[in-house]
Amino acid sequence: MEVKMNKNEQEDSKKLKYFRLLAKQYPNIALASTEIINLEAILNLPKGTEHFLSDIHGEYEPFVHVLRNGSGVVKRKIEDLFCKSLLESDIKSLATLIYYPEQKLDIVLKEERNIDDWYKITLNRLIEICRFCSSKYTRSKVRKALPADFAYIIEELLHEQFNGIDKEEYYDRIITTIIDIGRAKEFIIALSKLIQRMIIDRLHIIGDIYDRGPRPDIIIDTLMEYHSVDIQWGNHDMLWMGAAAGVRTCVANVLRISTRYANLDLVEEIYGINLLPLATFALKYYRDDPCESFIPKVKEDDPAASQEVDLVSKMHKAITILQFKLEKEIIDRRPEFELEGRLLLDKIDYEKGTIILNGIEYKLNDNNFPTIDPKDPYKLTDEESVLIDKLVYSFVNSDKLQKHVRFLFSKGNMYLKFNSNLLFHGCIPLDDEGNLKSMCIQGEEYESKRLLEKFDSLSREGYFEKVGSEEKTYGMDIMWYLWTGPVSPLFGKKQMATFERYFIDDEIAHIEQKTGYYKLRDREEMCDMILREFGLDPSESRIINGHVPVKKKNGESPIKANGKMIVIDGGFSKAYQKQTGIAGYTLIYNSYGLQLVSHEHFSSTEESIMKEKDILSTTLVVEQKLKRKTVEDTDIGKDLQVQIKDLKELLLIYRKGIIKEIR
């Protein structure tokens, strides 16, 4: 006869089962005690340094440089160590070597006459910097970061104290041997990369890796190799994610933006997407159309792009019209999206070349619509249907794009709570009075935290679910909605005036009203309300986001609501630097507090290497702690405290003889 256990007995049984598993890892009192001591020691170390970046918009050169120079921290560490013993020119050279070791070494090898002496001096300096940068981490953590080829040697050099003559000789012998056997170059590269890694413990990318910049792929490749990173998706990221999932409207939007900024090398050369069908279609229907409103924004110093302007303009117009047609499919299918107001092709008077919007009649600046039937303006022609199918096929079957988007899903999310900070790219949907805006999704109302979590899960369904399933179709529609919808936390505006910006000259029609979040984000009580919604304590938490460039040159502060919100979109994208007056922000959160670093314009990687020009950065202390924050004060610290509690309970179980020790 089976004896049923009551609830308490069941819980005790589960608990004992857990401790038996834990006992396999720590089979006796000695090992469990050692681990408790180790974990307690870790709790008292200074917290690791976090760096926050947002709105990179494909500008890979300044992004990679900021990672390499630790937003100016690497040079400050060198100055702290060598300000009294090195000239400023030597400090600049040493910093450049750490940022770009391979390239700088090639130059040094051509110019330096006594290379062995240079190697010896440089290796000693790099070891000292490396020791300084890694001093707040455990040996175990540093060991995991070491390059395999030099792990033992670097560990010896970092952690041994060379006080006696014998130890000094031992130290010098290691350095001399590295030089004698021809491994100094590789060792310098390894040390430089280790220094870069030790400067940043955790990297947060708060959205918009993609947009108009030339090489978001390089940014993602860099992040894929990074030791510790998370991503909060931006609206442009979601657009590419939707395109990779096969969302027709997202594909059209991605190509519209790519043609608008003549950034087709990314699409064709990097992601291998065949644009010949679009070019052929555009030439057929717009051969004699100057497409003046669709002339791409090309760089003045890019003659190749200028030569292709005529063709790209035609492609730009063709894909834009196709986008407007495709959007009707989703808008009709999802009335809960409330986007009927964006259906404008049927509002055009094709004979007069006008459109009435909000009671105002506007003259269109372009009335050539060869693929539109005025009686059925949203109907795709047979050629358009074939074209979009080919384009979607190319996106869905681009191996590199799929690899990048899978990475965005694996490391990304709609929001993140990390060490008492709330990270998201755009906004929390609010009305003009500051009330939370809800959205009906699949028959249920969602708002605030639940809304973002629902959008997150639906986006994943849109990408990962089986093709043709209801789950995938709905998720795909949501991915497009997140790009353009009025309750999208990634968009933050009441409408997207894409049609108006192309076809109406009157700029009043171009206005895109921001949601209540942006009108009220300076209010401390609004930030407190949002933080509480996400289960955070407003007295010690803050919101960190991007999306809207901070117009610093006009006196706007990135610090809002008495420090409760920090907006870090400072203009990595060159297009926004005229608005912001700077070239990006990095927020640094270390054991001493918060620092906001504003960056000046970055010329080029080549100039950084050849002329040793660094990004000029200005640091503003946002919050300084009287007592240094330790690991105990972090999310990891909370996890470690749970482990310590469990291990102490395991000790008690051993001492009571409930589980036998294995010695």
Curated annotation (Swiss-Prot):
Cofactor list: Mn(2+)
Biological process annotations from GO: gluconeogenesis
Pathway assigned to this chain's UniProt record: Carbohydrate biosynthesis; gluconeogenesis
The keyword rRNA processing is annotated on this UniProt entry: no
Reaction(s) catalysed (UniProt annotation): beta-D-fructose 1,6-bisphosphate + H2O = beta-D-fructose 6-phosphate + phosphate
E.C. designation(s): 3.1.3.11
Superkingdom of origin: Bacteria
Molecular-function GO term, any one: fructose 1,6-bisphosphate 1-phosphatase activity
Keywords: Carbohydrate metabolism, Hydrolase, Manganese
Classification via Pfam families: FBPase_2
Hydrolase among keywords: yes
Family the UniProt entry places it in: Belongs to the FBPase class 3 family.
The protein, known as: Fructose-1,6-bisphosphatase class 3
Organism placement in taxonomy: Bacteria, Bacillati, Bacillota, Clostridia, Eubacteriales
